[in-house]
Amino acid sequence: MKIVIINGSARKGNILTAINAFMKGAADRNAIEVIQPDKLHISPCKGCGVCQCHKGCVDNDDTNPTIDKIAAADMILFATPVYWWGMSAQLKQVIDKCYCRGMQLKGKKAGVIVAGGSPVDNIQYELIRKQFECMAGYLSWDMLFQKSYYATAR
């Protein structure tokens, strides 16, 4: 299975630790690629809709090559720290740009890893979980897991 991991954290902290643990368990049976949005040049989606008449985003940046990788994957793993009760801006920007080819993402397997500075019964995790459940329902994803971590230490 081809797995794409979108690392929504620019830091080498708890999210990277969780990604590495996932990769350790999955690497011998799968092809895994990690996308680091903070290392890419991806402009914010302008909502222009031109992408609906073309074969992808018209911005001359890293959007189309990034979405190509996501569209080619069998599974997408979204990994994010909690930023103000939501996913990180880095991850959200990649998700927003998926609009240009959204229906090509139908029927995939998905997973979510979230790390925050509050206990896992805090509403912040529920808010993020609901966002991914809505995306999964819309795109007919098989949501394999959603795991939240109280990131008190690595």
Predicted regions and their residues:
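N-terminal beta1-alpha1-beta2 submodule of the flavodoxin-like/Rossmannoid cofactor-binding fold
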Residues: 1-101, 137-151
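Short, charged/polar "capping" segments at the starts of alpha-helices
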Residues: 13, 120-122, 154
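Short, glycine-/small-residue-rich phosphate/pyrophosphate-handling segment
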Residues: 105-145
